[in-house]
Amino acid sequence: MTSRLLETGSTPFIRNTAAQQLADVQKQHPDELFNLLGRILPYLRSKSWDTRAAAAKAIGLIVANADTFDPNQDDGQEIKKAENDDLDVDIKSEEELLSPMDDSLLQLERLDLPSILKYGKRLLGSAGKEYEYSLAAMDPASRLQHQKKTLTSRLGLAGEYIEEDLINDNDLVSKPVVKEEPSFVASREHSIQGTSQPLASPIEPANGEESGLSKRQLNQLKRKNKQSARMGANKVRVVDLSSRRASENVTTPSVATPYPIKSENGEERNGDSKPDYFSLDRSAGDDESKIVSEFKGASVPENPLLQPESTEEGPNPNWPFELMCDILMVDLFDPNWEIRHGAAMALREVIRIQGAGAGRVQGKSRAENDILNRKWLDDLACRLLCVLMLDRFGDYISDNVVAPIRETVGQTLGALLSQLPSRSVISVYKCLYRIIMQTDLGLERPIWEVCHGGMIGLRYLVAVRKDLLIKDSKLMDGVLEAVMKGLGDYDDDVRAVSAATLVPIAEEFVKTRQSTLGTLMTIVWDCLSNLQDDLSASTGSVMDLLAKLCTFQEVLDAMKANAAVNPESSFGKLVPRLYPFLRHTITSVRSAVLRALMTFLQLEGEGTDEWVDGKTVRLIFQNLLVERNEGVLKQSLQVWSELLNSLETRGSFKSESDLLSHIKPLITLSMGPFGVPRYPVPMDASLFIKPSGLPFPSSAAAPARSSPASNTPEGTKGRRRKSEKKEAPPPSAHNVDGHMLQGDIDLVGADTMLRSKIYAARALGQLLFVWDQNQLPSLWQSILEGLNHSASTSQLASAMIVEEYAKLSGPSGRYASTLCENLRPIIEGERPPWYSDIACYLHVARAQCHSLLNTFRDHAHVPGSRLPVLAVIVQGDPEAGPNAFSLSDAEKVIGPDFERLKKGLTPAQRITALQVLNDTRATAESAVNEARNAREQRDLRVRAAAAGALVALSDIPKKPSHIIKGMMDSIKKEENAELQQRSATAITSLVEYYTTSAKRGPVDKVIGNLVKYCCVDTSETPEFHHNAMLEKSILSLRKEEDRRDHPDAAKFEREAKEARIMRRGAKEALEQLAVKFGSELMAKVPNLASLIERPLKEALAADELPANIRDPENELGQEVVDGLSTLRAILPKFHSGLYPWVVDLLPLVVKALQCNLSVIRYAAAKCFATICSVITVEGMTMLVEKVLPMINDALDVHHRQGAVECIYHLIHVMEDGILPYVIFLVVPVLGRMSDSDNEVRLLATTSFATLVKLVPLEAGIPDPPGLSEELLKGRDRERQFMAQMLDVRKVEEFKIPVAIKAELRPYQQEGVNWLAFLNRYNLHGILCDDMGLGKTLQTICIVASDHHMRAEEFARTQKPEVRKLPSLIVCPPSLSGHWQQELKQYAPFLNCVAYVGPPAERSRLQSALPNADIVVTSYDICRNDNEVLNPINWNYCVLDEGHLIKNPKAKATIAVKRLLSNHRLILSGTPIQNNVLELWSLFDFLMPGFLGTEKVFLDRFAKPIAASRFSKSSSKEQEAGALAIEALHKQVLPFLLRRLKEEVLNDLPPKIIQNYYCDPSELQRKLFEDFTKKEQKALQDKVGSTEKADKEHIFQALQYMRRLCNSPALVVKEGHKQYNEVQQYLAAKHSNIRDVAHAPKLSALRDLLIDCGIGVDSPSEGDLSGASYVSPHRALIFCQMKEMLDIVQSEVFNKLLPSVQFLRLDGSVEATRRQDIVNRFNTDPSYDVLLLTTSVGGLGLNLTGADTVIFVEHDWNPQKDIQAMDRAHRIGQKKVVNVYRLITRGTLEEKILNLQRFKIDVASTVVNQQNAGLGTMDTDQLLDLFNLGETAETAEKPSDAAGNEVDMVDIDGNVKEKGKKGWLDDLGELWDDRQYQEEYNLDSFLATMKG
């Protein structure tokens, strides 16, 4: 499964975790290396980027966990590191060491670049031919051989490459089978020169005959083969390729391929690792294979192809990864870009980690191996260079073109260069230099992709081998020359890479090449000025290079030198070249410009700031007004601040002349209003300037909202080129800002508009402060006018500007008094009647009122004279006068006027018009309310901003109520979070102002209100009085239920939203106070401390709560809850100096947890959890010492509830932080999972389910600091317990204290140890050992032991809790005798009562029940006698075959769950039979609530698992299913113990399962066809129905088909529609309906029995008389129906095999007699056969007397068949057990067997052998969770996908025509360019190289 998650994982986290898990498997099982790599390799070829990346990561991690290969390790020399080698190597000695075979490797010195470019096959996105399909159809070894054979040609090294047709005519002619000559497979040595060798010599037709096929037929066959090859191409094949060493000569067999690949049904053809009992697939013909199960003995697995094969001398001497790299190196040249990409990533990982061992061989000297290593790496370098030259694939998805292949190959080359000696690095560099320069490659014209590839290679060379660059001056010069050429290239993508190449070595280059700096800087600046295109890819890279270079003084000196020679090169001329990019359409470019400008502003030196002027100021400010990206906005403000500093330093503020003309428009723009949705107010575009300084044309302000196509000029669809040097028109610099300029709130959003106003206000505040400090003439006039502007947004902006200015200047500013005078009226006076920017709301209200009056006129026929007249102009309009339409007019119309007019209506008018009038009035009322709300919101904003400004100016009157109200209203109601934060800051400043003044003023009241607002949201802070009566419930559970539908959902949602806003504002203010005052918070604001502390001390000082706490007028209870809630809200922001104060409160919080009121416990639990997450050491210590002991308080349920609720919240609040403490919590929570209180139990099981999943992670976590020695000791004890719980093998040995009359096998002793462990910790579990392993015996041992120990304890202490209690065993009726017999045999000292039989018999036994040791009864009796069994307290309650309570609604299940017992145990060989919901029912008996409620379980587990089974399930659904099954498995793991027979019984002979097919008889076929014709239509109509009758009809039809498979006699009876027709048919044949000729299964059964020697005539001669002849085999024959048993008995035994002696066991046999029949069959060998029904004979019985099992019929439920066959295959069986399944070919029976397979897979994944311990998951099991009918390995469909197209829908929603392609079908996936940013980030790549 884990490797499936590489593909299906929906998030990088899941995929990376899967990769990590696979690496862990390798760490723990080093021998799995090649198997793992082989399984991951196919995912490198996936179409999905993420899958390939995850697979490469997995390979990297696995390879890192493998040992480094160094054959000369013992020589005592280290492998020389590439950096340490010397440049001059002794070449002669090397030549001597070369072996002849090295000629086959490519050599850097001899690489023919011109030939490669001239003749090499270009690598595009995909091949575009059937070539790749044909390759996919080959088996892997042949494919590798073919590709290596053609590689030299494809590289262009053997002249022009001509594509050969893989499917040639000879392939289509059948060839005589002759032994082929050996051919080389996968041999690297022959990869270059192998072109002349054919794969296998074509065989001439015998006697020179023609092939017998015409040309037309040949062409037809060829097309057909290509089609099937194409369909095979999508398969992901697990490269579990059989072990064939590459360099060995291997004979390719001519018939069967020995390479097991994934077959269509997802099963591997060489067998599966886990026993799959029912693997049938009709399409593959009959499954004649035998499945040998539980075969013990050393199996010899085939090695994977990736594993080098051993030689006669021993293990293979070569580098272990050589074969894999061979495959990957061939894939580097695959026509499909995805395959090239995956191969390059994998090679990068392998070479990075294991490259030093490549090419080395055991038995050679260190020197020889070093040369072999270099040769091998050189060869790979040559291949990578070839890819860089030939690759032409580019992706135009993001800002830049990304060439994923060239980038990844560049990284691979980087990884390789770190391993290469200097000499080879120089050779690589020389090749790259030639590729970039393209001067000597014989090209007619430069190829930009080739140059781009070379540049990428150079970039990684420079980054990885900086050491060589510093040493070798020629290398540095060459790199510089190449980069300069690249920067001047006509292609902007080449420029981008060139710029990025220089960034890592900028420092070295600047220090060593000062002479070339001037030239370089000229090129870089020219590069920027040439970027006319708005979408130029290289802009950001060039900008970053520029910013980096300009941080060096040497560069600045060079620029100054340039400027001295050429005035055009001065800073003043150069920097303005960046301005056009400030409003570039690409965010990253805008950000890069600001970074560059920031760098220039921070430069020191003469002339560096001459570009800083009024134009710059204006352009940066324009950024603030129109930028929508918050990150760029912040950068712009930083640049603005730096700009003002720079201007001040230069003295630009000494006179106003330069800047004033630029500043005034900015003030006007900042004050400009903006509108509301649908009614925008545009900015004044004429006040903007272009980068050139010219005014901005107003016509271009907004982009028209047209379709994108209309804006796209012709001819832009191809590659962006700069070759045609036409004069491009200058781009529209503000195109990106059109919507902001238009004020288009619908598209931009009001919050974005407000944010830009806030940033503009902050910038202007800074400017005004500097302006006023320089004593310049006042600019305040226009700003103060804004305070009286008709638009609210202008007033808001003006007030914010004043506030920002005041924050810097304080109360002592020059204009402070003037500002205060202008602000006070806003706070104290009336607001204007309306605002112009929301006049639209009033227009809508007027229109609705007008409509209402018209309704009176038109519908109620009220004369116009009686209707009021509405003014046309509304308040807020420019020409509005005193009589304009106002809000009060609107309220009058919908209020008094409406009532007056309604009163005047006649009854008749009322009847006709009232409904319409009421509806129209409601609409009008809604419009009026909306207008009122808009107006109130604007008033609130302006007042809050003015109040904030007054606080900043410290103009606080003696009665500050107006100011406080302005800010507090904003805290309460402001929807915009940023404005609310500003008000919170102002409140904080106000509180600070009062804390420093003599009088505290209103601080306490303000703090009190903030605390109150913080607690207003009932979802966070519950109401005390509303919940005061709850004592014995846990409020956390109630609050989950409260989230139901409310009667008035809209009103509830509105109120909840208001409460959330209020809490957000108050919390923000309190947090800011905590941050501002730090450790002095409680001293400065003692009221806050008192509001938290006082109620807790008052309420909890005594042992009991105050008696009057529940009185409605008593507020103490609410104050306690509020105090705890407030502490929880602001604690994360507390200064650490306040922690001791909080720790002092902890005992009170613990006391609150013990309180008898649910609501206080709830608040305390949440508060305690937060304290633990912030002050972890003290909090957790208190938890362990004080809270956890409460959880076991048997006497006080409130203590237990408080503790468990606290733990529940702790888990949710601390998340990962709880890991070091998990171990402390598990055992206490575990103990409460069987609590008598339902709510404690529910919360404990929910918490435990979360904790148990964290336990495996806990061990690796270091000890948290500050834990006391005592706690650490305690943790070790708990760890021991957890280890025992998770691994049965670690459980302490349990000495059985009673004399059990049996010798326990080791695994049975382990089982008893586990049961004793559960007993000791009061846990409950399921013993689900395989059938026949002795579950009964293990149970008897623990029950008898526990009874004995309780009796001893009682004798010693007389404690009532250990008094004698009976134990109850509930089992199916046929097993009651079996239990009595086993108890008598193994524990005769126990007094056993069998509570079975008829009611009279049972009533006689009732009095004996309480005194018995063991009571055995059946499920039916449990249901019927519930009132007898319920009152008894049982010690153990054991459910044998416990899966019988799988249906939670069945009466027997409900009855069993009512029984009270100390210990609950389920025995079941098959706990999951059909679906996982059954497991929920079992756990609902064991530990109710552990798996959540049934609904929760369904949603979380059952539905995703079921959904993942369907063939059309998406990869998302498959992942959800895989994750759900994994989570469920981990959660139930500690409570199930399962061992399989093949694991523990070495002495058990194998079980062989065979399918025995028989063809339907003529009569059966006829009846099938008639039934199908007549019933099919009716059945199709009913399949989707939910009607009970329809379901029954379908069920009956299925039953009919099943019966017909067995014998026509079961269906053709009187009343059957074709009864007479069939009778005539039989009469004509002289036959009868029961004749075995018509039921082939019966004749097959007879043949089978005779083959087994059953029913054959006894030998006529010899010592034995016929009577005493015993058959060599004895059989169990299972049928589903009793009727079928009758037919077998009468037609086969009585007529055909009369000598067979048989017994019969079915439902007609009384339960009490069944065990006798079993005993007779086991002990008397003269009985040949036992006939059974699966339902009666399939459970629990021991029938080891038989060694043959025959299924005449099959159950839908696979576990019933498995149970049945294991009646014979169990302990005591000495012979091989043969299981035969009789199947009627081509019928419903095959469908049943296919369905069985899925059910078995689910069951074996949730409950598997791991439940014997949490070991490492079996890799095969991790890999395939669901082996369904299709290839589960891939999200793509298998090769016969065309057959699954029924009902598929195409992209337009129409039903797909079969075989027809959709227009999107061939499109690869689209992805997010973040994948590129993450994958191709140079810094992260270098980090991995170091790591």
Curated annotation (Swiss-Prot):
The GO cellular component terms are: nuclear chromosome; transcription regulator complex
What is this protein called in UniProt?
Answer: TATA-binding protein-associated factor mot1
| Residue span of motif DEAH box | 1440-1443
Keywords annotated in UniProt:
ATP-binding, DNA-binding, Helicase, Hydrolase, Nucleotide-binding, Nucleus, Repeat, Transcription, Transcription regulation
Which biological process annotations from GO are given for this protein?
Answer: negative regulation of DNA-templated transcription; nucleolar large rRNA transcription by RNA polymerase I; regulation of RNA polymerase II transcription preinitiation complex assembly; rRNA processing
| First-tier enzyme category under EC | hydrolase
Alphabetized GO MF terms: ATP binding; ATP hydrolysis activity; DNA binding; helicase activity; TBP-class protein binding
Give the species this sequence originates from: Aspergillus fumigatus (strain ATCC MYA-4609 / CBS 101355 / FGSC A1100 / Af293) (Neosartorya fumigata)
